[in-house]
């Protein structure tokens, strides 16, 4: 039942000769070799004739004809292989013509040396890795490879290789690239390696051994800074070489990494001489971009002069979605078993804004960093640092001593309570302005500010951290809003249990959070008391969506369960609230209506909103959710002459005017397929203008989705896109089932 694997012929183990023939019919190789999850049945015939068993000495001829064979649950068909081995020299010819893998292979080589010679010609016409069960994603490829290496010794590499007719494809893309060519030449005095491709060029000339290059560079650095864990006995031959490298964002690279779009070519030139302990390196990148992160005019240099390795990294400017850099640099030197560094950040007027300078030196099994006492600048201000400060690190923890940063009445002090890296680490704030740090991140606008006083302590930092804090933040500011005064008390003296007391007061705010969070189980037992939350204090949190916000939110919530399945119980109610969305422009007034939370989700019980004319809209019903990720709806929305749009005519609006409606809407279904049944009437008080996209909108097509971007009204396009992006961060909306009857009063005006 496991097949028939007969072998016939002659075998003389004493003389090491053989003349064998094997024929199988559905032999279960997986069963025989106890690898049935990998191998299956095979049908083949094979011959072996010759002498010897050592590949370097045997004189043998082999032939294999695999009619079909199963590997990883795929049945291969039509494999041919012929091999001829004669005293260490060999030739091989093979082909496979299968619907999902087709190739022709010719090769020869000499195996007598430690590093064999090799000559290969491979024509790969088809390779479908998904069909062959080698990958879970669709990937097919095609290429032709020709290689001829008289020596494959990496320290005396000689030969050439070319890969051309290169094509890749997956489920959505066909990718092509130009040929790749590698040439290596070796003599007693020099090694040359040249690589050419669409995405990269390399020229490497001089005296070097590939297997020793990394050790040679480490040895040079070791002359100036003792690398931890590196023995002095590593033997490296003399090296003297030059390298020129260019990296380009080719179409193939951009198809694989589209976030690099906008990146320019990166070039590097390196010269290295181990005997003279010389290094000269320059790397230039006019623009490096990854998604929304951009750096302009990156320039990195390193050289050896005056018994040191001098280095500098400079950028003209750089930015991320929330971060901006101007004329920034990191520079210094490595010498005398120390790494000296200075970080300089300038503002857009080229004025020094942040400077941090210090020295790193090896210390036992780790390292020690010391701040320069006379060169610290934070947000334009000079700060004092004690002379005997240091931060020491090893695998067991961090030891900080005498690290107190001071400017006038501001200070932040870090100190370990003991003299070992496992000692508790304490931080003490005194009149410390948060903007000193946050303006490093957001230099053009104030992100966060406030005055911090208090203490915090961390124990077992690198093993099982235990954290306690007693901090007060006076006049906490977020962007343009002053939120109030914040008290943060956290006790983590019991492992995996955080006891918290958080209090927000001032600016008409009175909010308190008390309870515990158990990190090991991600469980919580928290109580939120909103005695009064001033909505105006938090307008900046929703600045892109909310034009204005005032009034109060009050109530209480108990939070239990875990982060994957939180349970909220309680209610929140508004008090004289008014919210004006940016996109509609109509103020929505909410008197004293509530949102109730229970085990099933949250509930609106005749939740009423009034427009600026006092007309009413009501939401009633439930939103059911087991985890605040999946939702099911049972809600109604009714309105009587309610003004949903009241926006002035502005250059950046795609609609403006007044839009008044009567509405009777039922919403059911879930987040995957909301079901909406609506009756809507547009009333006579309507005077509404909708600006259609211009005649030449920018159209971007991505995998069947066409996006229209109105260039004449970019701000509203951005607002609408940000709204869609906010939806995409929640459960995916797969569709909508909408049934609507819409009537229009004859006196309603539309443009």
Model-predicted segments: where are they?
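Interface amphipathic segments
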Residues: 1-457, 461-556, 564-664, 668-751
């Amino acid at each position: 039942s496991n097949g028939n694997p007969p072998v016939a012929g002659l075998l003389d183990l004493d003389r090491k000769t053989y003349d064998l023939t094997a024929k199988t019919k559905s032999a279960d190789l997986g069963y025989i070799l106890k690898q049935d999850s990998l191998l299956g049945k095979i049908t083949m015939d094979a011959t072996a004739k010759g002498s010897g068993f050592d590949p370097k000495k045997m004189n043998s001829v082999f032939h294999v004809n695999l009619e079909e064979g199963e590997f990883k649950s795929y049945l291969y068909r039509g494999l041919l292989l012929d091999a001829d081995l004669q005293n260490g020299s060999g030739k091989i010819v093979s082909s496979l013509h299968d619907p999902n893998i087709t190739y022709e292979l010719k090769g020869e080589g000499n195996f007598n040396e430690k590093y064999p010679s090799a000559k290969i010609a491979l024509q790969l016409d088809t390779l479908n890795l998904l069909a062959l069960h080698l990958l879970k994603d669709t990937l097919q490829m095609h290429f032709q490879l020709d290689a001829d290496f008289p020596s494959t010794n990496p320290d005396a590499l000689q030969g050439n290789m070319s890969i051309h007719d290169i094509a890749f494809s997956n489920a959505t893309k066909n990718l092509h690239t130009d040929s790749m060519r590698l040439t290596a030449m070796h003599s007693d005095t020099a090694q040359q390696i040249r690589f050419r491709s669409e995405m990269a060029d390399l020229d490497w000339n001089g005296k070097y051994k590939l297997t020793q290059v990394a050790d040679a560079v480490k040895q040079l650095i070791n002359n100036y800074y003792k690398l931890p864990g590196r023995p002095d006995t590593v033997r490296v031959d003399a090296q003297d070489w030059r390298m020129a490298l260019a990296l380009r964002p080719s179409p193939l690279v951009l198809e694989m990494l589209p976030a690099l779009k906008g990146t320019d070519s990166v070039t590097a030139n390196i010269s290295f001489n181990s005997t003279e302990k010389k290094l000269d390196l320059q790397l230039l990148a006019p623009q490096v971009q990854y998604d929304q992160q951009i750096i302009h005019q990156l320039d990195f240099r390193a050289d050896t002069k005056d018994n040191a390795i001098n280095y500098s990294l400079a950028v003209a400017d750089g930015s991320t979605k929330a971060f901006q850099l101007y004329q920034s640099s990191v520079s210094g030197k490595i010498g005398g078993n120390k790494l000296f560094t200075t970080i300089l950040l300038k503002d857009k007027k080229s004025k020094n804004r942040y400077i941090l300078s210090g020295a790193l030196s090896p210390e036992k099994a780790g390292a020690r960093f010391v701040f320069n006492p006379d060169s610290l600048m934070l947000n334009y201000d000079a700060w004092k640092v004690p002379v005997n400060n240091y931060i020491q690190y090893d695998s067991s923890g961090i030891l900080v001593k005498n690290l107190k940063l001071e400017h006038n009445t501001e200070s932040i002090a870090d100190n370990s309570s003991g003299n070992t890296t496992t000692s508790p680490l304490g931080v003490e704030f005194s009149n410390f302005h948060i903007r000193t740090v946050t303006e490093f991140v957001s230099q053009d606008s104030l992100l966060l500010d406030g005055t911090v006083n208090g203490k915090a302590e961390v124990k077992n930092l690198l093993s099982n951290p235990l954290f306690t804090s007693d901090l007060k933040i006076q006049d906490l500011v977020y962007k343009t809003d002053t939120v109030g005064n914040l008290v943060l008390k956290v006790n983590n003296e019991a492992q995996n249990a955080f006891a918290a007391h958080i209090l927000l007061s001032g600016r008409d705010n009175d909010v308190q959070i008390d309870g515990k969070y158990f990190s090991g189980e991600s469980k919580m037992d928290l109580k939120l008391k909103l005695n009064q939350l001033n909505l105006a204090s938090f307008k900046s949190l929703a600045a892109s969506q909310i034009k204005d916000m005032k009034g109060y939110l009050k109530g209480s919530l108990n939070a239990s369960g875990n982060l994957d399945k939180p349970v909220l119980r309680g209610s929140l109610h508004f008090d004289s609230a008014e919210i004006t969305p940016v996109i509609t422009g109509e103020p929505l007034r909410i008197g004293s209506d509530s949102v109730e939370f229970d085990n099933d989700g949250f509930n609106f019980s005749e939740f009423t909103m009034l427009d600026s004319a006092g007309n009413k809209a009501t939401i009633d019903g439930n939103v059911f959710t087991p985890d605040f990720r999946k939702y099911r709806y049972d809600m109604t929305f009714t309105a009587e002459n309610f003004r949903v749009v009241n926006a002035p005519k502005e250059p950046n609006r795609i609609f403006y005017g007044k839009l008044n409606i009567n509405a009777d809407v039922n919403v059911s279904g879930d987040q995957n397929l909301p079901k909406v049944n609506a009756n809507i009437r547009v009333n006579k008080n309507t005077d509404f203008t909708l600006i259609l996209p211009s005649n030449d909108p920018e159209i971007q097509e991505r995998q069947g989705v066409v996006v229209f971007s109105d260039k004449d009204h970019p701000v509203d396009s951005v607002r609408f896109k940000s709204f869609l992006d906010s939806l995409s961060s929640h459960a995916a909306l797969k569709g909508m089932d909408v049934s609507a009857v819409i009537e229009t009063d004859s006196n309603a005006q539309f443009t």
